[in-house]
Regions:
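N-terminal localization/anchoring segments of enzymes in phospholipid and broader phosphate metabolism
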Residues: 1-527, 545-549, 561-585, 589-675
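Active-site glycine- and acidic-residue-rich loops that bind
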Residues: 537
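Hydrophobic alpha/beta core scaffold segments
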Residues: 552-556
Length: 675
């Protein structure tokens, strides 16, 4: 028997749970639409990275296999098979929600169902807003098929010259920055591509439009960097980003159009060349023909529309922790260690702490890591202001996937302001979220530390669940300062800490040691691990052994889980759960009954434990330990948003009509009351 679930199929099962949220009839309609948007955006990234990676391994005949022993070709086929039915489910769900929205006055209307007055408005919109932005190409001997960047959205048409009756083909690129949903009247929306299609004869004069289809390509978007040759890492990353849009096509999505037109499009894609003059390989490309609009990720336009608040869940306002004194956060931290649970408890104290440090004349230095900070960052703004007055040292991780460009921008801005900026660490990705502020008061140095499971990003802090920790303890600050020094001196690979634990050297051995300790207590042992993913085979094997010793193990794994629970003789004492709700579960909390409870930036994956700089933080303060344990206990009682994984790899909702509990709703209502 295979001891592991396939990683890729486990991820797809997570995205299925996202799709299930779109099917939840108890949710407001735009909340359901939001989950369709998330589903599609997730799947885009899965194809850009995971499927593209498998395709590369298969084409280069790399002999490695998945954790379950499946070959690259087998995994690609399993992915295609898994999605074949689910894509249809997604389309049906969109159509159901679309019909319900129509009854509520939000109408996504096909162009051919518009009346004459509405079509006149659409024509005006085309002339004033779209005509100058679309890029039409007639494909002939002098105009070959142009290069297509990743996530290109376009129309492909068969056209006929009215004078010569010659048949030819045309490509019309639609820019990504236009509004996809055009509101012709209050509540009446038409897709931009349908307006363009209806006016193609204004782009191709003296031609008749015979056939037309919308299509979208997804390309390999992973960035391969040879760090051994990197003298200027920022420059190397900048050059690599320019190549991202030139990757091989891994997925083709089409809508409408005849089978003949689709065949011509496929032939055209095979023949056109990229800027590097390498032909696109369509071997193994996954192709999907849709009965609904392409790219449901654009549904965010409707979800965020200001006129339909009644169709959304009410906004939750995070609570400010009462222990934080607005005038002097540092005094609050000096009194006691504090732990916040975002988004239920506000992220504002984190931003305020940095802003206060930047303006405080007693501040000597600020050291912190930045992984994903977003496009508009009050934290970076405060660091830029501080850099002219005090020592500011920032490690900006340029390898944060899909945030590379934003991080490059902030790294350059910080450097211009006078901050010391480190662009990452050789062959390691710095994923630890840490901040240490050093002040001088009464002729003494005082250190204030902030550590977190989440990013220094106020926007994501409103939709991700994370814990963040504040301390004025010297032993914690000393470890973080030591870690910063190891990053600056490129010695992080072999560094160890005294009070905290860091990857790649310490976290995995520590977790194994903690599992082994619970094994010594056999049936009295108890482990709860909450993470985004469980993939590391060595950790999984130790959990199997612990189960066989009688240790009770509850795993709350939001996404990928390669461990097989409830298998007789292997994992009978292990139960695996996943919570998918309106907030993205992102905190990592690790509980061992006979030792301690920890929070961490690291998931239980080889990349986190072996190829990243991560932190594992013990909760030595009893109040904080109890707060972390309470979070786990409430989630294990969830009967509305919790799924359980069985030994066959299937997830089923945990329900109890007599005791309904949505853990995320509970935390909203109880914020600051029980914590």
């Amino acid at each position: 028997m295979n001891r592991f679930f396939n990683r890729e199929l486990s991820w797809l099962a997570f995205n299925t749970r996202v799709l299930n949220e779109a099917k939840d009839e108890s949710l407001p309609l735009l909340e359901r639409l939001k989950f369709l948007a998330i589903y599609d955006t997730n799947l885009d990234e899965f194809y850009m990275i995971r499927v593209a990676g498998l395709k590369q391994l298969y084409e280069h005949k790399i002999a490695s296999k998945g954790i379950d022993g499946a070959s690259h070709e087998e995994q690609l086929e399993k992915i295609k098979h898994y999605l074949a039915h689910e894509i249809e489910e997604r389309e049906l769900e969109f159509q159901k929600i679309q019909a319900l929205l129509f009854k509520k006055g939000l109408c996504i209307t096909p162009y051919n169902e518009l009346n004459l007055e509405q079509k006149a408005k659409a024509k005006t919109y085309f002339k004033e807003q779209l005509y100058a932005l679309v890029l039409p190409f007639k494909l002939d001997s002098s105009h070959t098929f142009p290069p297509l960047a990743n996530l290109t959205f376009a129309l492909f048409a068969r056209i006929k010259d009215k004078e010569t009756q010659t048949i030819s083909y045309a490509l019309i690129k639609l820019p990504s920055f236009i509004f996809r949903f055009v509101e012709l009247e209050k509540g009446l929306f038409v897709l931009a591509e349908e307006i363009v299609e209806a006016h193609l004869e204004e782009l191709f004069l003296e031609h008749e439009i015979l056939d037309c289809m919308a299509f979208r390509v997804t390309c390999d978007a992973d960035i391969a960097i040879t760090e051994d040759e990197a003298h200027d890492y920022a420059d190397l990353m900048s050059k690599s980003l320019r190549k991202r849009n030139q990757g091989e096509i891994v997925r083709l999505q089409t809508q409408k159009g005849s089978q003949e037109l689709l065949k011509t499009l496929l032939a055209s894609l095979r023949s056109f060349q990229t800027h590097s003059h390498k032909k696109h390989k369509l071997t193994g490309m996954h192709a999907y023909k849709s009965t609904i609009m392409l790219n449901l990720g654009d549904l965010w336009e409707l979800v965020n529309h200001s006129d339909f608040k009644a169709l959304k869940s009410p906004n939750f306002t995070p609570k400010i922790h009462p222990h934080f004194n607005e005038n002097d956060l540092f005094k609050s931290i000096e009194k006691q260690d504090l732990l916040l649970f975002h988004p239920y408890e506000s992220f504002e104290p984190v931003v305020d702490l940095i802003e206060q440090a930047a303006s405080d004349p007693t501040t000597l230095s600020i050291k912190m890591t930045l992984y994903r900070v977003g496009k508009h960052s009050p934290i970076v703004k405060a660091l830029i202001e501080a850099a002219s007055k005090i020592q500011v040292s920032v490690l900006v991780e340029l390898k944060a996937r899909f945030d590379e460009e934003s991080n490059l921008h902030w790294a350059k801005a910080l450097e211009r302001a006078g901050a010391l900026v480190v662009h990452g660490v050789f062959k390691l990705k710095v994923h630890a979220k840490m901040l240490v502020i050093t002040k001088k008061t009464d002729n003494q140095l005082r250190h204030f530390t902030h550590l977190s499971t989440g990013n220094y990003n106020p926007l994501s802090a409103k939709i991700y669940t994370d814990v963040s920790f504040f301390s004025a303890k010297n032993e914690i600050a000393n470890d973080i300062i030591k870690l910063f020094h190891s990053l600056l001196t490129s010695s992080a690979t072999n560094s160890t800490l005294e009070t905290l634990f860091m990857a790649p050297k310490q976290i995995k051995p520590k977790i194994i040691e903690l599992i082994q300790n619970e094994m010594n207590h056999q049936q009295e042992g108890y482990i709860i691990l909450k993470a985004n993913a469980l993939v590391d085979s060595e950790i999984i094997e130790w959990l199997y052994q612990a189960s066989q010793k009688g240790v009770k193990i509850d795993l709350i794994i939001r996404g990928i889980c390669c461990l097989k629970p409830q298998v007789k003789g292997l994992s009978e004492n292990i139960r695996v759960y996943s919570i998918v709700g309106k907030y993205l579960e992102h905190a990592r909390i690790y509980y061992f009954k006979h030792e301690n409870i920890y929070f961490s930036s690291a998931d239980l994956m080889p990349r986190n434990l072996e190829r990243r700089v991560e932190l594992l933080v013990p909760a030595t303060n009893p109040k904080i330990a109890n707060k972390l344990l309470r979070i786990l206990e409430i989630q294990l009682k969830d009967t509305l948003k919790r799924y359980e994984l069985n030994s066959k790899g299937r997830y089923a909702k945990v329900s109890n009509p007599n005791d309904p509990l949505n853990s995320q709703d509970y935390f909203e209502k109880q914020a600051l009351k029980t914590f």
